[in-house]
Amino acid sequence: MLSSSPASCTSPSPGTDNPDKKVHWASEKRRRASSTDSESKTHLDISKLPRSRRPSRLTVKYDRGHLQRWLEMEQWVDAQVQELFQGQEESSEPEIDLEALMDLSTEDQRTQLEAILQDCPGNREPFISELLSQLKRLRRLSRPSK
């Protein structure tokens, strides 16, 4: 049975030879060490972690592969537009907003692209057809909620 006397409830002193009290102090030290360990883990140097362990705010919200496909698509569009407008000033190259195109139907997308590329000196039809087929395969990036 447990004793209700206050003498048995006092904290152990490190100077006595009671083995029970030494075990108690050892577990107390372990408990203290683990609390300081967890505090130090919150202040880790992120640059020293392996890449796979580094926190990435962007990929928390979006899938890395999905973002990579969007990036590749945008780079492809930029390269194609530069090729179509080759020999003209860079300021005359139009901006194509893929997000805005995703909101439109396929026919409206084609109409919008033809309007954007109306000043294009090159043949724009193969580019428009390829872009429309790639847009069908591309999923929309969800907009962050406020």
From Swiss-Prot:
Compartments reported by the entry: Cytoplasm
Q: In which tissues is it expressed?
A: Isoform 1 is detected in intestine, kidney, lung, spleen, stomach and brain. Isoform 2 is detected in testis.
Keywords, alphabetical: Cytoplasm, Phosphoprotein, Protein phosphatase inhibitor
Compositionally biased residues, Low complexity: 1-14
Q: Where is the composition biased (Basic and acidic residues)?
A: 18-28, 38-48
| Reported function | Inhibitor of PPP1CA. Has inhibitory activity only when phosphorylated, creating a molecular switch for regulating the phosphorylation status of PPP1CA substrates and smooth muscle contraction.
Protein family membership: Belongs to the PP1 inhibitor family.
Its protein name is Protein phosphatase 1 regulatory subunit 14D
**Source organism of this protein record:** Mus musculus
List the lineage, top down: Eukaryota, Metazoa, Chordata, Craniata, Vertebrata
Name the gene that codes for it.
Ppp1r14d
